[in-house]
Curated annotation (Swiss-Prot):
Keywords: Acetylation, Activator, Coiled coil, Isopeptide bond, Nucleus, Phosphoprotein, Repeat, Repressor, Transcription, Transcription regulation, Ubl conjugation. There is a cross-link at residues 33, 592, 944, 974 (Glycyl lysine isopeptide (Lys-Gly) (interchain with G-Cter in SUMO2)). Interacts with MBD1; the interaction is enhanced when MBD1 is sumoylated. Interacts with SETDB1; the interaction protects SETDB1 from proteasomal degradation and is required to stimulate histone methyltransferase activity and facilitate the conversion of dimethylated to trimethylated H3 'Lys-9'. Interacts with SUMO ubiquitin-like proteins (SUMO1, SUNO2 and SUMO3), with a preference for SUMO2 and SUMO3. Interacts with SP1, ATF7 and ZHX1. Interacts with the general transcription machinery, including ERCC2, ERCC3, GTF2E1, GTF2E2 and POLR2A. This is Activating transcription factor 7-interacting protein 1. One of its GO terms (cellular component) is nuclear body. The modification N-acetylmethionine is found at residue 1. The gene is Atf7ip.
Length: 1306
């Protein structure tokens, strides 16, 4: 029992805490105190009435029960409201009592509400305890608790479940209804309900229980009892099992055992009497639930014995005990449930039915035996049962009460319910007590009868009961004062002046309506605490009070309600001592109380404050309660204060944390800003340096220009060197290969470029040009395909102006950089070179700004065409009709006008291909820009070399007529500005016209102007005449198949004649690479420079930077120089000399953008014989003598893509190669063979390709560095793979580089 008491205390603590959390309860209590006086009167009346009722015979009890039922019906209803308002409050306990009665009436509904309330109370109360959880859950475990009640589903639901929520109630209703249950309705029937309110409730409960078990009460009971018989199964099983569960729940281990035992007893008890068995069930359940199942059980056993005899006693006892223990709604539930089963039995005849019902027969037999004493006995046992639960409570409160039980059994049934209620008071106890009370009315009568029989057992029970009684009273008071529910429970069950207390309760409920809910959690816990603490004390106090005078008690208790509730725990022991005296009063009080309770339950529901008043009245029982309550309140206040202080502290701490975070955040921001500023400063310095570098480079290219007289190679080499040196860093960074070094005058270079271009499979389509140009230009055009375009976008085809001077070659290495090398070559190649200086700046964003440098003398102005090349800068310089390496380059040879009309398009394939469309039209007059087309008169040779993508400078001045815009289409990148394309197209069309007119062979450089006009109209207007280069001698040199038509080579102009200047633009550094032109005239950016038709080969080598290509900036400046093409030589510049755009696809897409080499080699002087194309055809691959059979399943090694880059520090060339896409079907590569080809003016033969080394295959991409080259020479490199079977794969597209240019450029 002590153990039970402790759990109760726990519950008390929980409630106390809740109450503390909600101060409203205290206020309500205070308000209630005001009403205490009134409550006192009512309590006195109620007490008296209770006393009367208590004595009343079972019949009267039945009346009370009926009354209660009615009241309960109302109560149930009220409680339902209350339940909703304060389902969890103690009031529910009262409602339970009421519910029991009502449940008899409503049974399920009433019980449900009241039980719900009760359970709610319990749950609130008990949950703290833990048992409550089980209890309420008992209730709560609806099945468990009420199930303990034997109404697991039903009663418990009704009673407990309500707690569980209305679910219980619903369940109850449902179960009860479902059960319909006579059990459900059993109250009436069971009440026989008359059996007793308790019984009736149990009835209702039982029905509920019954329901759970089965529709029919008897069956339920039987089943229940059976279950009970099952012991834990018993009523508990039915609902009883839940009880068991609850018991288990409450105190699973003991509970169950106890439960089982109680169950057995309960079975007996249930069978014995409706109320009793319900109680009994409850008891078992309660017992099991009870922390002191043993004790409880012991009591139960006694009770059970008695209870079995009386049938209900044990259940009641257990029930009460559990209730007390658990406070435990479980107990209460059990009690209720027990009664329910009993009631079911009552309905079916508590004893007989139960016995008939099931195994319970045994128990019934026992119960009947014990019960057999009579239903009165049952009632008694019910009472006893309740007492026992009370006893349990008492036990919980004090194990001492058992002795007193005997005497008080008769009373105790009533008192016990009251006590039980008190025990329940937390919610649970009240609930139980109310249930008990309901049972009690019947029980009391029966109890009285049984009292003697069961007195022995009940002595113990009585003690418990007494304590329970006190407990119940206290819980009632608590319910009244602390919690509406608790007060209501108290007042109803425990307070004799139930009516008064009920009024108070009603008031309280009304006043606490909302608070009650709030308080129900807070108050209930507090109440539970109070109840638990006070149960014994209150019981004692109340008993004393009752013995003395209820009014007296009521008033003092009312006054002390809150304090009492808190102090009750302490008083419990005294209360327990008093219970014997109180039992009688309790009984009477209970009978009336219950009766009144049913009425008051309703009121209480509405009146929260009244509950408190009632509670207070009860508390008054002890004088020291005030002090205790004060202490408790003080403690609560301290707790609250501490909580507030903690909250303030937390808030302050949070604010501080926020401030600290803000400060830290600011620090971080400052640090980041500082970092960014430092970075910006560094970048600014770099950009400044880059710009200076560009200026220097641009300035330097003009200086290098060699007099036109100089051999093209020298000039080219010088220019290339200069550019290369400037660009070498970029080259290194980008590991681009330089495009052909100083273009050898001979077309060989163009040829080589062509081959590479063809390899690139330039999409360039040269309209019939190729044949017209026999000169290397056609061969060079093939280079147009700028597969490696990734970088190729930067490729600018430099047109060599046939000026007789060396052709400048412009190598644009940086992919990102689109070099517009307007080769405005006056007769001197220098101009071209300086024009080549025009670079297309690539913005890192990937937009390529093409500065078209018009090589045409007329248009020297460079136009910047922003080309947005996402991945690669596509040089879309419409500017030069020079050969667009990837796209067809139209070169008009003097012989064919149409080819001139064609535009070269350099498209940068998304991968690496940039196709430069340069329309080279030698249209003398057509200048899209409105620049007058070059004077075709110049030389028929005038060739328009559209400098591919970049070179706005038409490759030759003659290119100006080509006005080919180099449209670099990034097919992959997709985008050269459409405007550029359009311009290119326009220029192309115009150039086409011009070329047709020029077809005589004269290509006007003016086309360049036109072109520049399209790209950059303003500058294009440079002297047209100079631009004219006679393309009459087209080199029919076949373009590499890939290369679209070869640019027309002026028929008379041999490439060799003009020196070829190569400009290498390396995009490595963001700075722009200056393309050095050696224009005779200074290169003015954007200046239309009359181009002396010099045969300059402009070789644009775009080496894709291995890394992102740094866009070249400041490219424009050179363009003017290029532009300045002065037709120095009356000789028409034979730009037409075949300009070869060598687009090297050697770069693998994966690696840095492929380098695009556009060799535009216009024939030097028209008279010069066409140069041989370079490089010579690659050597044939030897076939292995014999292949192993497995080789048949594999294909030849893939064709590598080669990229060249210059090593600035040493005169070295870096060869890097990879494959565009890995072909899994190829055999494993064993080694790579490197071949080099030194370009010489002499004839080209395959034997000139020398194998320079063999490298064991490693994972691609691979690279190797070659050194020790003869400066001033142009080298071509090719790589092919050899697989493990000795088979050779195809050569990569040959890539060329000008060794000299790097030395010069430095």
């Amino acid at each position: 029992m002590d153990s039970v008491e402790e759990p109760q205390k726990k519950v008390f603590k929980a409630r106390k805490t809740m109450r503390a959390s909600d101060r409203q309860q205290l206020d309500a209590v205070h308000r209630v105190k005001g009403e205490l006086l009134r409550a006192d009167g009512k309590l006195l009346n109620g007490s008296h009435e209770n006393g009367d009722l208590d004595p009343t015979s079972p019949l009267e009890n039945t009346d009370c029960i009926q009354d209660r039922e009615e009241v309960n019906g109302i109560d149930g209803i009220c409680f339902q409201s209350e339940e909703s308002t304060t389902e969890w409050k103690e009031t529910p306990c009262m409602p339970n009592v009421a519910v029991k009665n009502k449940q008899e009436d409503l049974n399920s509904e009433a019980l449900s509400p009241s039980i719900t309330c009760d359970l709610s109370s319990r749950v609130t109360t008990e949950p703290g305890s833990g048992s409550p959880a089980s209890d309420n859950p008992g209730c709560g475990t609806p099945v468990s608790d009420n199930p303990a009640s034997d109404n697991p589903a039903s009663d418990n639901p009704a009673s407990d479940n309500p707690d569980s929520g209305d679910l219980a109630a619903g369940e109850l209703a449902t179960t009860v209804q479902a059960t319909g249950d006579s059990a459900c309705e059993e109250p009436p029937s069971s009440d026989p309900s008359s059996s007793d309110p308790t019984s009736s409730e149990p009835s209702s409960s039982e029905p509920t229980c019954s329901e759970p078990i089965s529709g029919d009460p008897v069956s339920e009971e039987a089943a229940s009892h059976d279950l009970v018989s099952g012991d834990s199964t018993c009523s508990e099983p039915v609902s009883g099992e839940p009880v068991s569960h609850e018991a288990a729940s409450s105190e699973p281990a003991t509970s169950e055992p106890a439960s089982d035992e109680p169950v057995a007893r309960v079975v007996a008890a249930c069978e014995l009497a409706p109320g009793e068995s319900a109680l009994d069930d409850c008891a078992p359940s309660g017992d099991s639930q009870s922390d002191e199942p043993p004790s409880s059980e012991d009591s139960l056993p006694r009770s059970v014995c008695s209870g079995l005899a009386s049938g209900e006693l044990t259940p009641g006892e257990l029930s009460v005990e559990p209730a007390t223990d658990t406070v435990k709604p479980s107990s209460s539930a059990v009690c209720e449930a027990g009664p329910d089963p009993d009631k079911t039995e009552p309905s079916s005849n508590n004893s007989d039915d139960c016995p008939g019902k099931s195994e319970d027969d045994e128990h019934l037999d026992q119960i009947q035996s014990k019960d057999s004493c009579d239903e009165g006995n049952k009632v008694n046992s019910n009472v006893v049962e309740k007492e026992e639960p009370l006893e349990t409570h008492s036990a919980i409160i004090c194990s001492d009460l058992p002795p007193e039980n005997t005497t008080k059994i008769a009373e105790d049934p009533i008192a016990e319910p009251a006590l039980e209620e008190e025990a329940i008071s937390s919610s649970m106890e009240v609930d139980q007590s109310e249930k008990d009370e309901h049972k009690s009315p019947a029980e009391p009568v029966a109890a009285v009868s049984e009292d003697p029989a069961e007195e022995d057992k009940e002595d113990t029970v009585v003690d418990n009961t007494d304590s329970m009684e006190t407990d119940e009273i206290i819980p009632i008071l608590e319910k009244l004062a602390p919690t509406e529910d608790e007060l209501s429970c108290f007042s109803k069950a425990s307070l004799l002046p139930v009516e008064t207390s009920q009024d108070l309760e009603d008031k309280m409920e009304g006043s606490f309506g909302s608070p009650s809910k709030q308080e129900s959690s807070e108050n209930l816990p507090k109440e539970a605490f109070l109840v638990l603490s006070d149960e014994e004390d209150l019981s004692c106090g109340k008993d004393e009070s009752e013995a003395v005078a209820q009014s007296k008690m009521s008033t003092p208790e009312g006054e002390k309600s809150e304090k009492d509730g808190k102090a009750e725990e302490e008083e419990r022991v005294p209360a327990e001592e008093q219970p014997p005296v109180r039992n009688e009063f309790s009984r009477r009080k209970r009978s009336k109380s219950e009766d009144m309770d049913s009425v008051e339950s309703k009121r209480r529901r509405y009146m929260d404050e009244e509950y408190e008043a009632e509670f207070q009245v009860k508390i008054t029982a002890k004088g020291d309660i005030n002090q205790k309550l004060q202490k408790v309140i003080q403690w609560l206040l301290q707790e609250k204060l501490c909580a507030l202080q903690c909250a303030v502290f937390d808030k302050t701490l949070a604010e501080l944390k926020t401030r600290v975070e803000k400060i830290e955040c600011n620090k971080r921001h400052k640090a980041v800003l500082t970092e960014l500023q430092a970075k910006i400063a560094r970048l600014t310095k770099r950009f400044g340096a880059a710009k200076d570098d560009l200026k220097k480079r641009q300035e330097s290219p003009p200086n290098p220009p060699i007099s036109p007289g100089k051999p093209a190679n020298d000039t080219n080499s010088n220019n290339n060197m200069t550019y290369r040196n400037a660009g070498t860093v970029r080259q290194l960074l980008e590991s681009k290969r330089n495009v052909s070094e100083g273009p050898p005058p001979s077309f060989q270079t163009p040829v080589n470029t062509v081959s590479s271009a063809s390899h690139a499979t330039s999409t360039a389509v040269v309209s019939s040009q190729p044949k017209l140009q026999t000169s290397a230009t056609s061969g060079s055009l093939p280079a147009a395909p700028l597969l490696p375009a990734p970088s190729t976008a930067t490729v600018v085809a430099t047109t060599q102006v046939p000026s007789g001077t060396p052709q400048p070659t412009i190598s644009l290495q940086p992919l990102p950089v689109i070099l517009h090398v307007p080769v405005a070559v006056t007769s001197q190649p220098q101009l071209l070179q300086s024009h080549p200086g025009t670079l297309v700046t690539n913005q890192p964003s990937g937009n390529v700004e093409f500065i078209s440098v018009q090589s045409q003398p007329t248009v020297s102005g460079l136009t910047k065409n922003p080309v947005s090349l996402p991945p690669l800068p596509n040089p879309t310089k419409p500017n030069i009709p020079s050969v667009p390496s990837p796209s067809s380059i139209q070169r008009n040879s003097s012989t064919t006008a149409a080819p001139l009309g064609t535009t070269l398009a350099v498209q940068a394939v998304p991968t690496a291909h940039s196709i430069v469309q340069a329309t080279r039209t030698s249209l003398p007059t057509v200048g899209p820009s409105g620049l007058y087309s070059s004077s075709s008169s110049r030389g028929p040779i005038q060739m328009k070399i559209p400098i591919s993508t970049f070179s706005p400078p038409s490759s030759a001045e003659q290119n100006s007529s080509a006005t080919p815009r180099i449209v670099t289409e990034n097919q992959t990148n997709k985008t050269v500005d459409s405007s550029i394309n359009k311009k290119a197209a326009d220029s192309t069309s115009q150039s086409g016209k011009a070329s047709s007119s020029d077809s005589s062979g004269v290509i006007d450089l003016t086309m360049d102007d036109e072109e520049s006009g399209t790209t950059q109209d303003p500058k294009k207007i440079s002297p047209p005449s100079s631009s004219t280069v006679s393309t009459s001698q087209p080199m029919s040199r076949p373009l590499q198949p890939i290369l679209p038509a070869p640019p027309l080579q002026p028929s008379g102009v041999p490439t060799s004649g003009p020196s070829q200047a190569t400009i290498h633009v390396l995009p490595t550094a963001p700075t722009t690479v200056n393309v050095t032109h050696r224009p005779v005239t200074q290169v003015t950016t954007r200046l239309p420079v009359p181009r002396a038709p010099a045969n300059h080969q402009v070789v644009y080598t775009t080496l894709p930077a291995p890394t992102t290509q740094a866009p070249l900036r400041g490219t424009v400046m050179q363009a003017p120089a290029v532009r300045q093409v002065n037709p120095q030589n009356s000789v028409t510049v034979r730009v037409p000399q075949t300009t070869t755009y060598v687009v090297n696809n050697g770069l693998t897409l994966g690696s840095a953008g492929p380098q695009l080499t556009v060799h535009h080699r216009p024939p030097q002087v028209h008279n010069e014989p066409p140069r041989p194309l370079h490089p010579a055809p690659l050597p044939e691959a030897p076939q292995p003598q014999r292949l192993p059979p497995e080789a048949a399943s594999t294909s030849l090694p893939q064709k590598p893509h080669l990229k060249l880059a210059r090593v600035q520090s040493q005169n070295g060339i870096v060869l890097s190669w990879s494959v565009l896409e890995v072909d899994r079907s190829c055999a494993t590569v064993d080694s790579y063979h490197l071949y080099a080809y030194h370009e010489e003016p002499s004839a080209t033969v395959p034997s000139q390709w020398k194998k320079i080394g063999e490298v064991k295959a490693l994972p691609l991409p691979m690279a190797c560095t070659l050194t020790q080259f003869v400066s001033g020479s142009k080298y071509y490199f090719a790589v092919r793979a050899k697989d493990i079977y000795g088979r050779f794969g195809p050569f990569c597209d040959p890539q060329s580089t000008d060794v000299i240019s790097s030395s010069q450029n430095s």
